Design a protein with these regions (language model features):
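Predominantly soluble domains enriched in secretory-pathway, periplasmic, or organellar proteins
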Residues: 1-310
């Protein structure tokens, strides 16, 4: 019988876990090297690829990790570790519509590409991000264009992973850009600036800021809802969520989270979001009522998640 399952990285428990969404029961945990972080799945949801960031946060020093961890979602087994040395502190991950895998080395500020991640033993290509401390990135569906969030240079840069002669195009949207969301038509990139405490909309063609509004304290991540009309903002400093209009970036609703919201994911068919909180819970947030329906108790520091049916 099919079961809706929440896949969850628990960063400070150093594992990848499977949770039953209906009961909140933890079904299994797979131990990983210290401080795994972001993950993506292929389109068939056969494999998850976890980046071994290897340090607790972007503010922690250290060489960090240099491997991608390939996990079989159904057998709950670590298939292999893909060593991407010398590229380290692997953080942002994306997959394009052809299931090609893109990984961002924060320390080396390089965007790496694995054409066939289930078989490749090394990156097949790499392009510089054009920034410093490149943390996360947005990717167009075809994989031809990426937009890197560069924490220390305070820039967002447009790069083309498949064009080795393309020079990165930079935009300065504010101080410490981190959160991002790409519109469905890929013409607008939304970015949250943690130190400036602003939300901006960037024209992806010109790389110019077209809208900028004040945010709440320390907006870390942005998540565009399926209808494209509303966006969720995790306000890390204020311990809250904001729901904003994606056209104007004006706040429509505001909800206290009690603890700091680290990341969230949407249910694929229901109006629910699963919000990872730093008090070791995942909150089940009802997008219709803008209230939490309940919580799932987790291990230390739940992070990136995804709902799958197994």
């Amino acid at each position: 019988m099919a079961r809706e399952t929440l896949l969850l990285v628990e960063k400070c428990a150093h594992c990848f876990s499977w949770y039953d969404i209906e009961t909140g029961q933890r079904l299994y945990s797979l131990q990983l090297p210290d401080y795994p972080h972001e993950f993506v799945t292929d389109s068939a949801e056969r494999y998850a690829y976890v980046g071994h960031y290897g340090v607790e946060t972007s503010g922690h020093v250290g060489a960090g990790g240099h491997s991608l961890l390939q996990i079989d979602i159904r057998s709950r087994q670590l298939v292999r570790s893909i060593d991407l040395s010398p590229f380290n502190r692997l953080h942002g991950l994306q997959m394009d519509e052809q299931d090609r895998l893109y990984a961002l080395s924060e320390e080396k500020a390089m965007l790496l590409v694995l054409d066939s991640p289930s078989r490749d033993t090394a990156a097949r290509r790499a392009v510089p991000s054009g920034g410093v401390q490149s943390h996360l990135f947005a990717l167009t569906r075809d994989g031809q264009t990426a937009f890197c969030m560069n924490l220390l240079s305070h820039t967002v840069t447009k790069v083309r992973p498949w064009d080795p002669l393309f020079a990165p195009v930079a935009c300065h949207p504010g101080q410490k850009p981190e959160g991002f969301a790409l519109s469905a038509d890929e013409r607008t990139l939304y970015v949250s600036n943690r130190w400036s405490q602003t939300l901006v909309a960037i024209d992806t063609e010109t790389m110019q800021v077209k809208t900028c509004v004040a945010s709440r304290d320390d907006p870390t991540r942005l998540y565009l809802q399926a209808d494209g009309l509303r966006m969720l903002v995790t306000n890390y400093g204020e311990r809250s969520l904001s729901i904003v209009d994606s056209l104007t970036l004006k706040e429509l609703a505001h909800v206290s989270t009690g603890a700091r919201a680290i990341a969230l994911s949407f249910h694929p068919t229901r109006a629910l979001a699963y919000v990872s909180l730093d008090d070791d819970r995942v909150g089940i947030f009802n997008l219709a009522s803008c209230e939490f329906d309940g919580y799932i108790a987790t291990q230390r520091e739940p992070d990136v998640s995804k709902v799958v049916v197994l």
